[in-house]
Amino acid sequence: MQGSVTEFLKPRLVDIEQVSSTHAKVTLEPLERGFGHTLGNALRRILLSSMPGCAVTEVEIDGVLHEYSTKEGVQEDILEILLNLKGLAVRVQGKDEVILTLNKSGIGPVTAADIIHDGDVEIVKPQHVICHLTDETASISMRIKVQRGRGYVPASARIHSEEDERPIGRLLVDACYSPVERIAYNVEAARVEQRTDLDKLVIEMETNGTIDPEEAIRRAATILAEQLEAFVDLRDVRQPEVKEEKPEFDPILLRPVDDLELTVRSANCLKAEAIHYIGDLVQRTEVELLKTPNLGKKSLTEIKDVLASRGLSLGMRLENWPPASIADE
């Protein structure tokens, strides 16, 4: 076995034993010692609690106002019917919510095959029994809401949020969205050349038929990898660059008007009006400057030309002027 002593072995998919369409065993090896339990436990938790799927969330049965009742001509009570609907395996394409209907009369079992649905919905186990009608005159009609979700959401978690708008007779069902019904893993010994301290991970799982077991493991591994991406990217995190704060005002506005090299007459007129900085000057208008004693149109034109050469003009508005550095002087 070649490679550095610090280099980790990469597992490969050794075998997929398809016990049935809903039951499979997946074997991965070789894994470094301890990694069998590390990966097996992580995948098991994701498969049980975080896999998306579809489940029955609400039911309306004609003639039934609450779940603690019975219906004439039906063998099961309403609670048992809701429990049977909870086990309904449904696959929905392209929608997050669908409404299914069921109408059945006459003696005999009522199964998932009796549910009316469109082409976007597939009932995976049509033989699944919902209830039994015990009389030739008995009948049952219901509307079944199926929604897409993740994990397990009890009806009690939705009661308070929907109480005000939920009409009487609409029965909430504990929603088990996960398509995985059973998952277990086992860690066995593995060997590569002279190394005998390695792990072999065997994952055994059963689904409700809405997803292939192999695909379920693939999705769980994808979820785990996506959650770990943030830790992988830690190596690329760089210290944020300290950006220099931009000055509040253009530095030229903080310079004295003497830097404009105006004629003595114009400079003296500005000083007489307490205009000491270029920032003070650009805030004045032509009308205001013409009111300055001894400052005529010739001086005004000179000032405008000098400011224009520096990309400035009269009548500018400067918020928060003067800055603290000038105000304190």
From Swiss-Prot:
Molecular function terms, GO-annotated: DNA binding; DNA-directed RNA polymerase activity; protein dimerization activity
Reaction(s) catalysed (UniProt annotation): RNA(n) + a ribonucleoside 5'-triphosphate = RNA(n+1) + diphosphate
Swiss-Prot/TrEMBL GO biological process terms: DNA-templated transcription
Keywords: DNA-directed RNA polymerase, Nucleotidyltransferase, Transcription, Transferase
InterPro entries in alphabetical order: DNA-dir_RNA_pol_insert (IPR011262), DNA-dir_RNA_pol_RpoA/D/Rpb3 (IPR011263), DNA-dir_RpoA (IPR011773), RBP11-like (IPR036603), RNAP_asu_C (IPR011260), RNApol_insert_sf (IPR036643)
Region (Alpha N-terminal domain (alpha-NTD)): 1-235
Record has Transferase as a keyword: yes
Domain of life: Bacteria
GO annotation, cellular component aspect: cytoplasm; DNA-directed RNA polymerase complex
EC number(s) reported in the record: 2.7.7.6
Keyword field contains Transferase: yes
Pfam families: RNA_pol_A_bac, RNA_pol_A_CTD, RNA_pol_L
Alpha C-terminal domain (alpha-CTD) as annotated region, ranges: 249-329
Matches recorded under SUPFAM superfamilies: C-terminal domain of RNA polymerase alpha subunit, Insert subdomain of RNA polymerase alpha subunit, RBP11-like subunits of RNA polymerase
HAMAP family: RNApol_bact_RpoA (MF_00059)
NCBIfam families: PRK05182.1-2, PRK05182.2-5, rpoA
Entry text on domains: The N-terminal domain is essential for RNAP assembly and basal transcription, whereas the C-terminal domain is involved in interaction with transcriptional regulators and with upstream promoter elements.
Assembly with partners or alone: Homodimer. The RNAP catalytic core consists of 2 alpha, 1 beta, 1 beta' and 1 omega subunit. When a sigma factor is associated with the core the holoenzyme is formed, which can initiate transcription.
Function: DNA-dependent RNA polymerase catalyzes the transcription of DNA into RNA using the four ribonucleoside triphosphates as substrates.
Family: Belongs to the RNA polymerase alpha chain family.
Name this polypeptide is given: DNA-directed RNA polymerase subunit alpha
Organism encoding this protein: Photorhabdus laumondii subsp. laumondii (strain DSM 15139 / CIP 105565 / TT01) (Photorhabdus luminescens subsp. laumondii)
